[in-house]
A protein has these predicted regions:
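H-loop/switch region of ABC-family ATPase nucleotide-binding domains
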Residues: 56-57
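Helical segment within the ABC ATPase nucleotide-binding domain
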Residues: 35-47
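A short, surface-exposed alpha-helical micro-motif characterized by mixed small hydrophobic
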Residues: 62-64
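A short, proline-enriched helix->beta-strand linker immediately N-terminal to the Walker B motif
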Residues: 14-18
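Helix N-cap at the start of a conserved alpha-helix in ABC-type nucleotide-binding domains
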Residues: 31-33
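Catalytic Walker B motif of ABC-type/P-loop ATPase nucleotide-binding domains
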Residues: 20-23
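C-terminal boundary and immediately downstream tail of ABC-type ATPase nucleotide-binding domains
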Residues: 83-114
């Protein structure tokens, strides 16, 4: 799984893009492979000056790699910094980013100031 995703990323980067769009890039990867892919993506983004637009439901990836987040709620897009989104009072956003599954990531992000 991880090698296939890395090969797909390499093919996309061969075109020397300024914008990279990824759809669920860590889906199907075990946690260690997903973390390695996130690290690779962050390194490439920094080294190549890429703008990355990513669709993901992976909270690990969101908290590790994103500096801005967009969420579609009630057929409308809302976006902000990660900290701003996690403070949004909408019940779905609160449940998603502060629910049982998300608690440890939110606490980690708060500690890191992201």
């Amino acid at each position: 799984g991880g090698m296939i995703k890395r090969a797909a990323l390499a093919r996309a980067l061969a075109l020397d893009p300024r914008l990279l769009m990824l759809d669920e890039p860590t889906a199907g990867l075990d946690p260690i492979s997903a973390a390695a892919f996130d690290e690779l993506l962050m390194d490439l983004r920094q080294q190549l000056g890429l703008t990355v637009i990513m669709i993901t439901h992976d909270l690990d990836t969101i908290f590790r790699t994103c500096n801005r987040v967009g969420v579609i709620i009630d057929r409308r897009m809302t976006s902000d910094t990660l900290e701003g989104i996690t403070r949004n009072p909408h019940p779905w956003i609160q449940s998603y980013f502060h629910g049982e599954r998300a608690r440890r990531f939110g606490q980690e992000a708060s500690k890191n100031g992201t």
